[in-house]
């Protein structure tokens, strides 16, 4: 249940998600006594088997994760390979912590920040470690606005490239200068979205004004931006750190981050979720429509996340806010019904991609706005990762294991 919204639904505990004690013990290569010890220490979840008062079932996800960790300790080379796919941490960062069911920015709950702080305030926290007013950048000279008929990512990338070419301080990588450049980039991203200079307005205020969503909608827009500010070492953050490690300026970091974010396996998933909601708007009954979509080989976009067992807290807050402010609207009722149907069929919770698409649907935002919100918010994290990477002075240069034809073969 999403507090205050009554978006309650039942998650199916399918047999595919749970296993018997004998199967779990076999996969882990341990005795049942050791398995029970893992349960008591919180490493493996268990629940009573259906129709039995004594037999218990064990979480397949937990068992697989525990087995992977054991194998990684025994074979470090395999651990290095797996680190590139939801594996063990490979870089240190003090920006974001994903802890089970919560997301933190520098030790502060991101959901709480999303209800009370602007994106610029969170940017100051992430970039400097403190809530302090960032020094305003010098005005950008006359720069032509990119054509409005190209996608937002392309508009932002072209605008950043042109401004970078004329910014004499683009390569000033001192910490104090980076925060100023970061704020300039954040304003340029907002400008690319609304087609005009936001001036001194915060990103959420500028977007809310351009999109005409009123006070209720402005709160949702602000929260969406803050919730997207960072999410640890995802593909775009890693891309940003790699680019920064070469010594490239922050404009290049964000241009590269946008390229990574746009992919359908990353931030582009929000666009897919937006399209899915549009196509399902009048489908009834929704549960059967969701099942039919799966039968056609089409995914239920915006559901499930490997790092959150009990659901993505970013989506939870966005749905809560929508329910608090638009609970009686037809679009929110549709979103709520869709969440119930999709969760019942798939056993998955909505993630941030769905949350952004739901916000766009309920607020009647322009097409593509879920990705726009994601990208502007995540700009803060990319710059934060760049600042951390610049400070290390290290070039990120992993090695590849050659598996091709042997020389002379």
Predicted regions and their residues:
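Short, intrinsically disordered or compositionally biased N-terminal tails of bacterial proteins
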Residues: 1-15
